Amino acid sequence: MRPRFFVVYLIAALVIAVDQWTKQWAASTIPPLIGYTVIPGFFDLVNVRNRGAAFGFLNRSDIEWQFWLFFAAAVTAVLAIIAMTRSAKSNPYLFTGFGLIMGGAIGNLIDRIRFRAVIDFLDFHIGGYHWPAFNVADMGICVGAFFVCLAVYKHK
């Protein structure tokens, strides 16, 4: 296996493992829709199911097509990352980003297949502002996108 694939797959595997472990922990420890306050007025641990995308986008129970949309998006992202990893020049920022995005996409895809929804459990809020609950896979996707942008910026 070429080193670039090893790096991408190793990072993806780590994200998937941490994501699935933390979701299992949250689902078995935190009462659904109740949660625990960790830092009053700022951070709670919750146990919610999100049928939509990251941060609650399209989280509606009255539409079924979003399962297939997000399923197809995750599979397409993984296949695109594999293809781009083959053709990309060596760039640690790019390969780190690819691994994080791939791991996040697969982590959430596992939930979609198992539960038809994604387990979200990290809930941040301050004052009247509330950020939608999210999970480790969502963080992988967002941080991975940052690394890909950084790779593009550094390449110029």
Curated annotation (Swiss-Prot):
One of its GO terms (molecular function) is aspartic-type endopeptidase activity. Its EC number is 3.4.23.36. This protein specifically catalyzes the removal of signal peptides from prolipoproteins. Keywords: Aspartyl protease, Cell inner membrane, Cell membrane, Hydrolase, Membrane, Protease, Transmembrane, Transmembrane helix. It is a multi-pass membrane protein. PROSITE patterns: SPASE_II. It holds the Pfam family Peptidase_A8. This is Lipoprotein signal peptidase. InterPro entries: Peptidase_A8. One of its GO terms (cellular component) is plasma membrane. PANTHER family: LIPOPROTEIN SIGNAL PEPTIDASE. One of its GO terms (biological process) is proteolysis. It catalyses: Release of signal peptides from bacterial membrane prolipoproteins. Hydrolyzes -Xaa-Yaa-Zaa-|-(S,diacylglyceryl)Cys-, in which Xaa is hydrophobic (preferably Leu), and Yaa (Ala or Ser) and Zaa (Gly or Ala) have small, neutral side chains. It is found in: Cell inner membrane. The active site is at residues 120, 138. The keyword Transmembrane applies. It is an enzyme of class 3 (hydrolase). The chain crosses the membrane at residues 5-25, 63-83, 90-110, 133-153. Pathway: Protein modification; lipoprotein biosynthesis (signal peptide cleavage). Belongs to the peptidase A8 family. Its main location: membrane.
